[in-house]
Structure formats: C-alpha cells, structure tokens
Amino acid sequence: MKKLCIFCGARPNFIKVAPIIRVIDRLSEGNNPHQVSYSLVYAGSENDPTLEDQLFENLSIRRPDVYLGVECENLNELTGQVMSKFEKYLQENPSDVVIVVDDLASTMAAAIVTKKQAIALAHIAAGTRSFDITMPKEINRLVIDGLSDILFTAGFSNNSIANKEGAELSKVYMVGNILIDNIRFDRERISGMTLSDIDELAGLPLKEGNYLVFTLNRKALLADQDNLEQMLRVLSETAGEMPIIAPLRDSAVQVIMALSLKKNIKLHNLHIVKPLGYLEFAYLTAQAKGIITDSGNVAEEATFNGVPCITLNSYTEHIETVKVGSNVLVGEDPELLRSALTDMVAGTWKKCGVPERWDGRSAERVIQILLERQ
C-alpha cells in the first residue's frame, strides 16, 4: 500500500486537495481497497476560525488528522516552526509521498523537510510564476518546484516554465486544473439552489445573471488608499444600477468603509456581506453577470463557468484564463477597470472557452500517476 501525506497550509489548500481525497476514498471503497492510504496534515490549529465544519461538509472530506498548531504572522518564524513540527511528524509517521499544493511559506517549509527526510515530494499547481522575485510567494514557488520529484501542472504554459527551469521531462505531468474537479463535483448539488437559499443575501433585489460579484483580499491593493478610492468610484459609477455583491473579510470591510466615509465615496450599489460558505459562493459566482476580483482561484472558476471576470492584477499564474478563458487583467489601473467593466455591464464580453484538460478529472490523473510510479 502506498502511504500519502497530504499537507495543507491554509484554507484554500483544502479546496484543491479535496478532489484527491475523494478519489482515494472511492478507491478504498472499491475492489482493491489496499492500494493507497493518506493522512491529512494542517499547519495551523484545530480552532482556526477559517476552517468551519461547513467547509469540510461542502467538500465531502474529513477534517485534518493532524494539526501542527503553528500560529504566527511573521513568515520566517512560521517557516521555522512548520519545519520543526512537520519533521517530527514525518519521523513518527513514515510516508511514501508528501503532496503539497500552491505557494505558501508553510508549503515551502513542508517541501524542505520532506526532501531532508528523503521522501518523494509531489507539487500540485507546479510551474506557476509571476516572474516578480520580490514577491515572497514567487520565492516559495521556485524552492518548492526545485525540490519536487513530481510536478503536477494545470496547463502547457506551466509545463514549459518547469522545463525551462531545469525540471526533467519525466517529472512533469500536465493533469489540468484541479479546482475544476470541485466545480464538476458540485454541479448537481448547486443546480437546485437559488439566491434566496443564501441567508446573507436576504432582502437584496437580486436576479440570476443580473448582478456583479466583487472580492478583494490583496494587502497591496488595500494599502494604496488613493488608488483604491479611484477604483471604488469607477466600480460604483460604471456598474450603474446593477447590484454589486461583495463577500468580504473584516480587514477589507474596515478599509473600504473607512475610506468611503473619509472621501465621501457614494457606494449606493455595493452590498457588503459576510464571507459565504463554499457552495454558496460557488453558486453566487456561477450565476453572476460578471466578477471583479483579485483572486486567481475565482478567475479560474469563472473561466470554467463562462462568467466574464476582471482581475485586479497585472499577472495571472494561469495565463490560459486570459488567452482561452473569460478573464481580463486590468492591474490596478482605474481606467482599464472602467473600460472592462463597461463591456461587462453591456454584455459585450470577449468570446471564451475552457482550457485543455480542465475537465474535472485532474485528481484521477494525479492518483493514477502516483500509483504507477515506483
């Protein structure tokens, strides 16, 4: 039996590893239940408020088996603590393969420890680059990919990046975007939903296909208040009477509300709501007229759903969302935002499609490859 350790450093990681866990669970219930087993390890604590029970219920996976209990803001301290605690875990719980996902500091720490323990390392969402070495996450990506024995990529552009940086061809596998597995898995459950099923939206005058969704989380965007002021004005003015639903965390809400009061920004059509559950947010975005976001994951899901998406960033880790999909990059430029938003509201968006292998079977490919490799 092959023993896998699946490592998660933060809430979004669980969403990306959930399809893998579901595939393993199906195998354990099949004719050959002894092929593979797994343990799910989380860098944080058991009482982490971002890990609500509903998340795991929506994803149809169990809660982590192990919590390392690391809680600190300083990335260097966090890296050291994760390395120390994860090393002890691996020494006490031998594994054949450690699976990591994305580009967090905790992910890099787990990758380093895995290689020091001479355990095979598999990286999901490998080969993603911003080409901005001043970004901490870019450093993490370079380290994780450089250490990985198996690199699972979402697109051919990611393969090309990994190969150019020296990864052997035999180590790189284009399996598709694993986020899409969740959307396909959830389609039947979401199909019976309506906007009225979402408590946070009660009382809002919403109709499917006739509202916008706005998410904002990047610290750099929130910190530049002069530019944020301009972008909020453009957002509200250009949307006109179309409602804008903004499921935002407290830090973003505080910045936006303080700025609107200080600068007298009229946000008559912006409806700020609390963060939604996983399935609720999936339905909200799938039924939207368009999405304005700084999240790469949200943009990827929008591409699969064919929903117009404006990304408030000058780059994307998955360029397929721009070249093939429904995504448009406007950076932090208010006038580019105005132009793109005008097209979005008018319904004159570009033609778009779904990138190759974004078919909901990425996790199956991952597990098949891991089982076939010696």
Walk through the language-model features, giving the residues of each.
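Nucleotide-activated sugar donor-binding and catalytic core shared by glycosyltransferases
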Residues: 1-244, 251-374
